[in-house]
UniProtKB/Swiss-Prot annotation:
Family designation: Belongs to the universal ribosomal protein uS11 family.
Name used for this protein in its record: Small ribosomal subunit protein uS11
UniProt GO molecular function: rRNA binding; structural constituent of ribosome
Assigned GO CC terms: ribonucleoprotein complex; ribosome
Leader peptide range in chain numbering: none
Any single GO BP term: translation
Keywords: Ribonucleoprotein, Ribosomal protein, RNA-binding, rRNA-binding
Organism for this UniProt entry: Chlamydia trachomatis serovar A (strain ATCC VR-571B / DSM 19440 / HAR-13)
Record's function text: Located on the platform of the 30S subunit, it bridges several disparate RNA helices of the 16S rRNA. Forms part of the Shine-Dalgarno cleft in the 70S ribosome.
Any Pfam family matching the protein: Ribosomal_S11
SUPFAM superfamilies for the chain: Translational machinery components
Top-level taxon in the UniProt lineage: Bacteria
The protein's assembly and partners: Part of the 30S ribosomal subunit. Interacts with proteins S7 and S18. Binds to IF-3.
Amino acid sequence: MVKNQAQKKGVKRKQVKNIPSGIVHVKATFNNTIVTITDPAGNVISWASAGKVGYSGSRKSSAFAATVAAQDAAKAAMSSGLKEVEVGLKGTGAGRESAVRALISSGLIVSVIRDETPVPHNGCRPRKRRRV
């Protein structure tokens, strides 16, 4: 009986938060595209990637997979009341522009598009050139 009371006490319902504005972080690498939607404080509301949406292997790096991932993340975020977003792009993958287009077409109002790609000031040695 003591265990039942402890279990009932610890269970809380997840409250649906109404967040009008947020930030979309799009990380477009050569192998995958990850879309994370946060509130202005940085707490994650929803996320999606090309792998999570169902693509695997070389299809994850396609622009269409990035579009589907962005639509999936936007739909989940709009269910919690999100309307207006700022977009931060990171990386040089194939899904950069297509992810932003998908966010706009899904009904989110995009106020700012920022390029946050990290550029080294001659940091690590780059990987060797690919010879095909």
